[in-house]
Design a protein with these regions (language model features):
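Short inter-helical turns and helix N-cap capping residues of alpha-solenoid HEAT/ARM repeat scaffolds
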Residues: 44-48, 85-87, 123, 127-131, ...
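Conserved hydrophobic register position within alpha-solenoid helical repeats
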Residues: 23, 52-56, 93, 138, ...
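Structural signature of alpha-helical solenoid repeat scaffolds
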Residues: 57-61, 98-99, 139, 143-144, ...
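Buried hydrophobic core positions in alpha-solenoid tandem helical repeats
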Residues: 37-39, 74-79, 111-119, 156-161, ...
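Flexible loop/turn segments at the boundaries of HEAT repeats in alpha-solenoid HEAT proteins
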Residues: 23-29, 60-71, 100-111, 144-154, ...
Length: 230
């Protein structure tokens, strides 16, 4: 037991240090035994959560090459955490989902539609995430996947545009950020301009691949608008 705690502590130290990315290959080599600790790190605050998500992506992508069914079971575990029937609030789960799909092309092809379904509100039986705080993460997750595999996320565009008018002000900014990760489209401009001009000061927490930072929803929309009209 003490050895297990020591290994978990070492893993945590690898992720919280300044050179954390240098440890990702070693973490990925650890395989399935690192999955449980990494899931637990999703609850340790924004920076550790994002870095643990990246590590989960690397571990699961490697497993997908060697043990594809095991990797799919990790995705199923993620989907269960997003399910209301699980009794859990899936903090950090959308981010982990996105990083796994960004790291693994086969898993992305199989599961990208599930990730996008969390922002699709059909007004009836659907996968829509109705927890405002968790939905912010869902928008970010789609943007993260769009960075790595934009073609898989093109069908999310109308729902991201709809997200610019989400009832949650932070969700609006996160939807704008996600939209900006897609190939530019002039059709995005009117809705982005409305949000940019709205003076929405809701702080949106973003991750640049190394650190967490904040911008307001209207700032994000203004930057996305600039990109859409180039």
């Amino acid at each position: 037991m003490a050895r297990m705690r020591s290994a978990k502590q070492k893993l945590k130290e690898c992720l919280t240090g300044p050179q954390w990315r240098e440890h990702l290959d070693e973490i990925a080599q650890g395989g399935l035994e690192n999955i449980g600790p990494l899931f637990s790190f999703l609850l340790l605050g924004p920076l550790t959560m994002h870095r643990a998500s990246v590590a989960l992506g690397q571990v699961t992508a490697r497993l997908a090459q060697q043990q594809p069914e095991t990797a799919k079971n990790i995705i199923r575990r993620i989907m269960w955490h997003m399910n209301e029937e699980s009794g859990n609030i899936g903090w950090g789960i959308p981010e982990a989902f996105a990083e796994i799909l960004a790291a693994s092309e086969p898993l992305a092809k199989d599961f990208h539609r599930i990730l996008m379904s969390y922002i699709i509100d059909l007004g009836r039986d659907d996968n829509y995430c109705d927890n405002d705080t968790l939905r912010r993460s869902c928008y970010w997750a789609i943007g993260r996947l769009a960075q790595a595999r934009p073609q898989l996320c093109l069908s999310a565009r109308p729902w991201l545009i709809k997200g610019l008018e989400d009832v949650d002000m932070v969700c609006r900014g996160m939807a704008a950020w996600a939209l900006a990760q897609l190939p530019p489209d002039l059709m995005d401009a009117p809705a982005l301009r409305r949000l940019a001009d709205a003076g929405n000061t809701a702080p949106c927490e973003l991750f640049d691949g190394h650190d967490v930072y904040e911008k307001t929803a209207s700032q994000i929309a203004a930057e996305a608008l600039e990109g859409s009209t180039k």
